UniProtKB/Swiss-Prot annotation:
Lineage: Bacteria, Pseudomonadati, Pseudomonadota, Gammaproteobacteria, Enterobacterales
GO molecular function list: structural molecule activity
Pfam families: Flagellin_C (PF00700), Flagellin_N (PF00669), FliC (PF12445)
UniProt protein name: Flagellin
GO CC term, one of those recorded: bacterial-type flagellum
Function: Flagellin is the subunit protein which polymerizes to form the filaments of bacterial flagella.
Cellular location(s): Secreted; Bacterial flagellum
Keywords: Bacterial flagellum, Secreted
UniProt record similarity statement: Belongs to the bacterial flagellin family.
Organism per entry: Escherichia coli O127:H6 (strain E2348/69 / EPEC)
PANTHER family recorded: FLAGELLIN
Length: 548
């Protein structure tokens, strides 16, 4: 080894080793001071990512357990109110049994009826005022989703029901046949014109003549035809057809499960408005002519373009759609397709329904619409109005046709005229200045009177038993969901514990190991400093050569 002064390689090597040991010592001290093995991604990149995901799960599951406990509280609050309602019903039943014996005087029956009315009023008060965190739990039908997991869709639903004297079938409950009973606000389903028709089909005449900017659809009223089935339609965005500009009559055929329609005006724009939902500028469709399919786009004006490249489509002399305009053909439109005759007769299928011409000129002739498109149809016995600026004329297929009109969220039956309000109630214009609210009496008939003359309830004990049965069924469902939520909380806590242990094994520092590493690093550091001092003295040995 050469004897040099300028470069002390031994000192450099020693310094490098001291620096490495210093880094290890710093890491050990950092881990011991924080309690974490992973203080940054450089300590363990993969471990840091895994531990971070565990953190998300643990925090989410911890909150989910709190949510589930809140859900249990909701169910307990609701069941507590139902328990009190049940107590009132049991007392009413006891009083009814007492009133049913012939030994009571009129005064006795009056006293019994007074307490029954007081108990029913208390049931209504409990229904209207029982809340959990500001939510009325017995005031209306609905559901409450409880998030019981750390990810989307991990919920448990609590079904809530409206429970009051009316929903229990006890509105106007009477044992003495005296006084008056309060009538309940009528809704659309109480209108006779919206009950299921006896005939297998019906005809619906639709006339649209209100605000042009309103989003409305003839399909809303088609869904009310007898034989339709499905869920309630609340907005026209749920349906696939727009509104034809001219009046069209639709007839439902139960055997073929389809609607047929007749119209005197079938211009491209009108047909496009019918096939094209008003929320969109264009509609994708498949046009079938002579067994050949062509995917197209249909704009608001009814013009057809190819779906694949947007090229303009033309209808040639044989009735086929083509991108080639060599023969001087004009652009294909919905009107041309719809009015094609004979072998050129076309079928236009959108994602919401199918239009089929019958092979004759479409000048008042029939067309058919696939009934399967109306998956959101409304059952007649549960029909509710879609509030919006629109007017409909409905004729069912029954022998004695019932006709109703709806405009701007208003339902009318002439005579008299009824209005369906946004909250589902009905008013009438018998009092043209203000409009009277329409009620349903205890006999089920519509009236503008707020009260009805009281009559003794027929089969009162059976009515009470049915009401108590409703309470029992509701309480059973709440008990079941409480048990389910309690089980969910237990599982969430177990999962959180296991995940926390797994995260700890990855992320937390092992103090025995780290203390050992720190002690080792400190000893090496001391030794390194001592050796460095000796290494720095090596160049001085060269001086002995100069002094010799």
């Amino acid at each position: 080894m050469a004897q040099v002064i300028n470069t002390n390689s031994l000192s450099l090597i020693t310094q490098n080793n001291i620096n490495k040991n210093q880094s290890a010592l710093s890491s050990s001290i950092e881990r011991l001071s924080s309690g974490l093995r992973i203080n940054s991604a450089k300590d363990d990149a993969a471990g840091q990512a895994i531990a971070n995901r565990f953190t998300s799960n643990i925090k989410g599951l911890t909150q989910a357990a709190r949510n589930a406990n809140d859900g249990i509280s909701v169910a307990q609050t609701t069941e507590g109110a139902l328990s009190e309602i049940n107590n009132n019903l049991q007392r009413i039943r006891e009083l009814t049994v007492q009133a049913s014996t012939g030994t009571n005087s009129d005064s006795d029956l009056d006293s019994i009826q007074d307490e029954i009315k007081s108990r029913l009023d208390e049931i209504d008060r409990v229904s209207g005022q029982t809340q959990f965190n500001g939510v009325n739990v017995l005031a209306k039908d609905g559901s409450m989703k409880i998030q019981v997991g750390a990810n989307d869709g991990q919920t448990i639903t609590i079904d809530l029901k409206k429970i009051d004297s009316d929903t229990l079938g006890l509105n106007g409950f009477n044992v003495n046949g005296k006084g008056e009973t309060a009538n309940t606000a009528a809704t659309l389903k109480d209108m006779s014109g919206f009950t299921a028709a006896a005939a297998p089909g019906g005809t619906v005449g639709v006339t649209q003549y209100t605000d042009k900017s309103a989003v409305a659809s003839s399909v809303d009223i088609l869904n009310a035809v007898a034989g339709a089935d499905g869920n309630k339609v609340t907005t026209s965005a749920d349906v696939g057809f727009g509104t034809p500009a001219a009046a069209v009559t639709y007839t439902y055929n139960k055997d073929t499960n389809s609607y047929s329609a007749a119209s005197d005006d079938i211009s491209s724009a009108n047909l496009a408005a019918f096939l094209n939902p008003q929320a969109r500028d264009t509609t994708k469709a498949t046009v079938t002519i002579g067994g050949k399919d062509q995917d197209v786009n249909i704009d608001k004006s009814g013009n057809l373009t190819a779906a694949d490249d947007g090229a303009v489509l033309y209808m040639d002399a044989t009735g086929n759609l083509t991108k080639n305009n060599a023969g001087g053909d004009t652009q294909a439109t919905l009107a041309k397709v719809a009015t094609a005759t004979g072998a050129k007769a076309a079928t236009i299928q959108t994602d919401k329904g199918t239009f089929t011409s019958d092979g004759t000129a479409f000048d008042g002739a029939s067309m058919s619409i696939d009934a399967n498109t109306f998956a959101n149809a409304v059952k007649n016995d549960t029909y509710t109005a879609t509030v919006g600026a629109k007017t409909y004329s409905v004729t069912t297929g029954s022998a004695a046709a019932d006709t109703a009109y709806m405009s701007n969220g208003v339902l009318s039956d002439t005579p008299p005229t009824y209005y369906a309000q946004a909250d589902g109630s009905i008013t009438t214009t018998e009092d043209a200045a203000a409009g009277k609210l329409v009620y349903k009496g205890s006999d089920g008939k519509l009236t503008t009177d707020t009260t009805s003359k009281a009559e003794s309830t027929s089969d009162p004990l059976a009515a009470l038993d049915d009401a108590i049965s409703q309470i029992d069924k509701f309480r059973s469902s709440l008990g079941a969901v409480q048990n389910r939520l309690d089980s969910a909380v237990t599982n969430l806590n177990n999962t959180t514990t296991n995940l926390s242990e797994a995260q700890s094994r990855i992320q937390d520092a092992d103090y025995a190991t780290e203390v050992s590493n720190m002690s080792k690093a400190q000893i090496i550091q001391q030794a390194g400093n001592s050796v460095l001092a000796k290494a720095n003295q090596v160049p001085q040995q060269v001086l002995s050569l100069l002094q010799g």
